[in-house]
UniProtKB/Swiss-Prot annotation:
Required for the accumulation of coenzyme A in the mitochondrial matrix. PANTHER family: SOLUTE CARRIER FAMILY 25. The gene is COAC1. GO terms for molecular function: coenzyme A transmembrane transporter activity. It is found in: Mitochondrion inner membrane. Keywords: Membrane, Mitochondrion, Mitochondrion inner membrane, Repeat, Transmembrane, Transmembrane helix, Transport. GO terms for cellular component: mitochondrial inner membrane; mitochondrion. It comes from Arabidopsis thaliana. This is Mitochondrial carrier protein CoAc1. It comes from the Eukaryota. One of its GO terms (biological process) is mitochondrial coenzyme A transmembrane transport. It is a multi-pass membrane protein. Disulfide bonds: none annotated. Solcar repeats lie at residues 21-107, 117-218, 225-319.
Length: 331
């Protein structure tokens, strides 16, 4: 009887899924892919942020020592500090990213733009989709970074600064971060660091889809839906895309946590005027190697993250019976 009820419930769910428009199914598939992939690598993401922002007591540590220090200061749950904001952000971000990629790709092909029908279409559609998703969800990324930047050791609350002691602001959750950012800078405060983010996401998102789709084209048709195909193709796509754009990610993170840093000699904590000033200042004051701080852990993180993301997305598309692109494009 239990088996019969389970079968009925499963059939009801699939009947409901079948009534959804293709774009709605794509949104759900993308959101699920983003949430699962992001949570799987959350501990590594937090360590990367601490290394990128040169957080006190983490400046000279490697990956393994940083993991031990987070465990010492914040306990096991410390590895997931900021992950709530990250997941809340990544669900709409990934949903929009994958969905708008499909929309932009179909639109380019439908309008017969002079891009052909090969991988260049994936590059352009992926870049446009990445920019769209970032603009819609950036404040949540800002909140995630500020929460992940905090370390709960009491020695971190008071730090020697240029003007005596500087008390680092602390946040209880996403709502407080966003409220404080808006209070300090208005709407622009919610988008602090958006410049390097957009400059970085356009090539990264484009390259990610470009490389993934290009690799898929070399896979035999009978293996196109195989998990063993999605994992390595997604991993390589993420690896190449992140390497090229990583310095911009470092600038973004440092701009996002500026208000948590000690005051400068000018009496403020705004260190960078814009993206390129940030790149130049980091090289001049922190050394060029800081532009790649946390890159090793990012390699460890991005390979499973992108691989899991593409794999879950493709699996969800198959489960939800989303038709292949050739059949789903407008006539």
């Amino acid at each position: 009887m239990g088996s019969s009820q389970g079968s009925t419930l499963s059939a009801d769910v699939m009947s409901l899924v079948d009534t959804l428009p293709v774009l709605a199914k794509t949104l759900i598939a993308g959101g699920a892919a983003g949430a699962i992939a992001k949570t799987a690598v959350a501990p590594l993401e937090r360590i990367k942020i601490l290394l990128q922002t040169r957080t006190n007591d983490f400046k000279t540590l490697g990956v393994s020592q940083s993991l031990k220090k987070v465990l010492q200061f914040d306990g096991p749950l410390g590895f997931y500090k900021g992950n709530g904001a990250s997941v809340i952000r990544i669900i709409p971000y990934a949903a929009l990213h994958y969905m708008t990629y499909e929309v932009y790709r179909d639109w380019i092909l439908e309008k017969n733009l002079p891009l052909g029908s090969g991988p260049i279409v994936d590059l352009v559609a992926g870049s446009a989709a990445g920019g769209t998703a970032v603009l819609c969800t950036y404040p949540l990324d800002l909140a995630r970074t500020k929460l992940a930047y905090q370390v709960s050791d009491t020695r971190q609350s008071l730090r020697g600064g240029a003007n005596g002691f500087y008390r680092q602001p602390t946040y209880s959750g996403i709502k407080e971060v966003l409220a404080m950012a808006y209070k300090e800078g208005g709407p622009r405060g919610l988008y602090r660091g958006i410049g390097p983010t957009l400059i970085g996401i356009l090539p990264y998102a484009g390259l990610k889809f470009y490389i993934y789709e290009e690799l898929k084209r070399h896979v035999p048709e009978e293996h196109q839906n195989s998990v063993r195909m999605h994992l390595p193709c997604g991993a390589l796509a993420g690896l190449f895309g992140q390497t090229i754009t990583y310095p911009l990610d470092v600038v973004r993170r440092q701009m996002q946590v500026e208000n948590l840093q000690p005051m400068t000699s000018e009496g403020n904590n705004k260190r960078y005027k814009n993206t390129f000033d940030g790149l130049n200042t980091i090289v001049r004051t922190q050394g060029w190697k800081q532009l790649f701080a946390g890159l090793s852990i990012n390699y460890i993180k991005i390979v499973p993250s992108v691989a899991i993301g593409f794999t879950v997305y493709e699996s969800m598309k198959s489960w939800m019976r989303i038709p292949p692109r050739e059949r789903s494009k407008p006539a």
